[in-house]
């Protein structure tokens, strides 16, 4: 309690905006009349609140388009431009994004940058780690856990833009496929926008390709293998495919820091 009281005393009240006087509205003089519009201070405050509501992990605090390093790789530069243009044009284009590529190339960085750009435009967004979401849903089946599956999924079902990070990271099972289908189909039917990242490149499942024996075991798993062919097809109705391919982004910075 004492700590909280000290924090309250130490807080410095924000200065009143000299433009709007704290109302959040400012006058705009047109040629023939006078109008009011939202003040910049209100928009900044709104963006800050929406960013907090998006529940981004603190490890991504510094992730935006200006901090993404392409390292001179044309494919990464092209991916960055495509994603940033999409974020700038939203909501003119409400089709989502599917960012696929090898681990460590900065897919989540770019997806988070897009999410932040949308909050600056007043869009309600939510970050979801695919593995954490499935784990929380599984835990909700425990009688000692108060949150129900529906309560956990409601924000995922209702938020205008959801970033589903690392799709396919959990070993596939009927339950996993059913849960992924529920999430994606619900958002699809509600015409909500979804940004997805995955380390698994696009491709049909092994069962669809009818691969057997050594050929099947040597083949790299695809997105179709991890989420099921039906949901892979649904993704392409919901999202623009963006291939993010290049040198390991995280390894590059670890190497730079060791020099």
Regions found by a protein language model. Give the residues of each.
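Short glycine-rich substrate-engagement loop in P-loop NTPases that contacts/grips substrate
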Residues: 74-80, 119-158, 174
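A short, basic N-terminal segment
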Residues: 1-78, 254-259
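Loop/turn-to-beta-strand initiation segments
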Residues: 123-124, 158-161, 190-196
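Pre-Walker A (pre-P-loop) alpha-helix and adjacent loop at the N terminus of AAA/AAA+ ATPase modules
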Residues: 69-97
């Amino acid at each position: 309690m004492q700590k909280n009281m000290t924090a309250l005393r130490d807080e410095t009240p924000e200065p009143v905006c000299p433009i709007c006087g704290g109302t959040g509205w400012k006058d705009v003089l047109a040629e023939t009349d006078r109008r009011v519009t939202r003040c910049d201070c209100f928009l900044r405050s709104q963006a800050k609140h929406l960013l907090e509501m998006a529940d981004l992990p603190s490890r991504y605090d510094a992730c935006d388009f200006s901090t993404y390093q392409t390292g001179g790789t044309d494919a990464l530069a092209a991916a960055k431009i495509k994603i940033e243009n999409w974020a700038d044009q939203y909501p003119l284009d409400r089709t989502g994004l599917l960012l696929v590529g090898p681990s460590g190339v900065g897919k989540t960085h770019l997806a988070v940058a897009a999410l932040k750009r949308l909050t600056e435009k007043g869009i309600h967004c939510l970050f979801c780690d695919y593995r954490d979401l499935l784990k929380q849903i599984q835990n909700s089946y425990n009688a000692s856990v108060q949150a129900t599956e529906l309560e956990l999924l409601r924000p995922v079902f209702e938020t205008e833009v959801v970033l589903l990070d690392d799709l396919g990271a959990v070993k596939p099972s009927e339950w996993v496929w059913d849960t992924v289908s529920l999430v994606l189909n619900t958002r699809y039917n509600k015409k909500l926008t979804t940004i997805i990242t995955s380390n698994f490149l696009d491709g049909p499942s092994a069962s669809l390709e009818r691969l057997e024996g050594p050929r099947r075991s040597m083949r790299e798993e695809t997105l179709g293998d991890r989420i099921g062919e039906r949901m892979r097809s649904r993704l392409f109705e919901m999202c623009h495919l963006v291939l993010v391919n290049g040198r390991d982004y995280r390894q590059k910075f670890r190497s730079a820091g060791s020099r």
